[in-house]
A protein has these predicted regions:
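Ubiquitin-like/PB1-type beta-grasp interaction modules and other compact soluble beta-rich domains
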Residues: 1-64
Length: 65
């Protein structure tokens, strides 16, 4: 299916947020996620379905000062 990740087009086989994160290389990284502008908590990612055309945002925390 075709989705966008951080504004870039991606073709993925996975159908949940958690599986997509693994497929695109985030694995178990500590990140925040939003699907179509709505926050998706870490404990909801495994069940949160993603559909063709959806927009996934993945944000990693910054460190330093």
């Amino acid at each position: 299916m075709k989705i966008s990740v951080n504004g870039q087009p991606h073709e993925v086989k996975a159908t949940t947020v958690a599986a997509i994160l693994t497929e695109i290389g985030y694995g178990d990284a500590t990140v925040a996620t939003a699907l179509n502008g709505d926050f998706v908590a870490a404990d909801r990612r495994v069940n949160q379905a993603v559909r063709d055309g959806d927009a996934l945002e993945v944000l990693a925390p910054r460190q330093g000062g």
